[in-house]
């Protein structure tokens, strides 16, 4: 469904919206024709605002590749999903960041957007390292009964691998 992602990070929703407007205003002032051409080429989009619930390593450079899992969840049980990630999965992800297998990981909650209610991300140096780490995560999850509980709360998802082409802290 998606082929490109553009995102902004900030310490609050107000700061996020201010940063997004500033970037948009600068792009329009610099080259309206180029912005129009970009809009013609990438002529549809979905807007989401996410809030970080848990994660590690997101305050520094994330590496060259990201694996994102966009979850459709039972809204009444989202808090339970958050608690599971923090208690059952965060220690594994944190260790993978400490060991260098991952550059970062994150678990985010939906603030604004469409059907996806939670977003899990992992990043690594490159796609090969990312997929190796992802395989280790899947193997660990298959042995963890709490992973099946998470699957009952968030029973549908879409997976994307992103090559990070440009990132400014």
Language-model-detected regions and their locations in the chain:
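Glycine-rich beta-strand-turn "strand-cap" elements at beta-sheet edges
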Residues: 1-4, 28-65, 102-119, 142-169
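Short amphipathic alpha-helical segments
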Residues: 77-103
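Well-ordered, non-membrane alpha-helical segments in soluble/globular domains
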Residues: 26-30, 84-91, 139-140
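Charged, low-complexity, helix/coiled-coil-prone segments
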Residues: 22-37, 73-83
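Short, well-ordered beta-strand segments in beta-rich or mixed alpha/beta enzyme
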Residues: 1-25, 63-73, 106-141
């Amino acid at each position: 469904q998606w082929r490109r992602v553009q995102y902004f990070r900030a310490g609050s929703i107000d700061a996020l919206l201010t940063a997004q407007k500033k970037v948009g205003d600068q792009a329009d002032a610099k080259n309206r024709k180029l912005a129009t051409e970009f809009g013609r080429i990438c002529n549809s989009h979905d807007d989401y605002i996410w809030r970080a619930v848990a994660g590690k390593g997101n305050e520094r450079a994330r590496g060259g590749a990201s694996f994102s899992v966009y979850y459709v969840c039972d809204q009444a049980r989202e808090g339970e999903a958050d608690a599971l990630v923090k208690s059952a999965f965060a220690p594994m992800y944190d260790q993978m960041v400490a060991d260098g297998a991952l550059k970062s990981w994150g678990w985010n909650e939906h603030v604004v957007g469409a059907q996806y209610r939670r977003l899990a991300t992992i990043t690594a140096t490159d796609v090969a390292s990312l997929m190796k780490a992802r395989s280790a995560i899947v193997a660990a999850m298959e042995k963890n009964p709490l992973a099946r509980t998470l699957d009952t709360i968030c029973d549908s998802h879409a997976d994307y691998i992103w090559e990070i082409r440009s990132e400014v802290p």
